[in-house]
């Protein structure tokens, strides 16, 4: 494990606790959420779109009420900048979980520690504690115990074709589709479900994602029987490219769309909107983090949630980029190849411009995959 990661990833973990935990408490956000949660639980019946205690189980209803308070301003459009940041967030951190799932499926990670790589396990931790709090520690331990991280080879990095094809289905049906449904305006979805129902179901996305993957894998395994084994390498490479390509496309679309809306509102068409909306959608409001050590306070759930999402994304994406860089370097070391750091820096900047740090991370791991597969292919031909 490279020395840089030994220190950098734990620093990200500590930064997550400070910027998401301590900062949220100090700026008054936690107290506001608790007050709003109690107001939700005490809400009188009558509104069919808001049920105060949907399950009747006190502890569960309290947890759900906190989630409703958190997500309501994200989805109802009352804070345009927050809604835009959430769309940008969906095109970043959840896609990082796809990369983590990919690592969990590799042959070298199927051991007595396989439970550690479970995307369902880490997904539920992320739901309860935010992604940025959990991801740095997962990545640190992964680099310490995973053979695919320290000694990447075609053998230990291999993934069955059915698993790869199931992951493609999972990305579309288990991740992208639920995210789109929860982000749609209630005027569109109200005939199917209320916003409260959508939030509740979306919180269980790690289970839906796992179920989709399991069903798709079983179906695909049955259809793959009797397939021509001579074309196996080509089909596996094609499946890998589909996984990385879909993930990169989702990251790029979210990044370009959200930045385009923000820049258009701030500089191209500011007169077409109210001054309040223009200010809310300004890049400095949406994408520039509020430093957690400044003596600032918030008086609304929307503003506090925006600050939390900004730091959740910053820490989570930053940590996974360092992780991907170490995997990228390990692959080059294993193949005795040198990295042209000048070209690498230019390439990273270019990918960040069109797809953010998530897109740059995907590109690094994609290049690593291609390198190991080509080396393994060449080795097979010499036998």
UniProtKB/Swiss-Prot annotation:
Origin superkingdom: Eukaryota
Transmembrane segments: 5-25, 79-99, 121-141, 164-184, 243-263, 342-362
Pathway: Polyketide biosynthesis
Cellular localisation: Membrane
Topology in the lipid bilayer: Multi-pass membrane protein
This enzyme's EC code(s): 5.4.99.-
Protein name (database record): Terpene cyclase aurD
Entry's family note: Belongs to the membrane-bound ascI terpene cyclase family.
Main location: membrane
Keyword entries, A-Z: Glycoprotein, Isomerase, Membrane, Transmembrane, Transmembrane helix
Keyword Coiled coil: no
Enzyme class, broadest EC rank: isomerase
Organism: Calcarisporium arbuscula (Dendryphion arbuscula)
GO MF, one annotated term: isomerase activity
GO cellular component: membrane
Residues of this chain annotated as glycosylated in UniProt: 109, 156
Its job: Epoxide hydrolase; part of the gene cluster that mediates the biosynthesis of aurovertins, fungal polyketides that exhibit potent inhibition of adenosine triphosphate synthase.
Gene: aurD
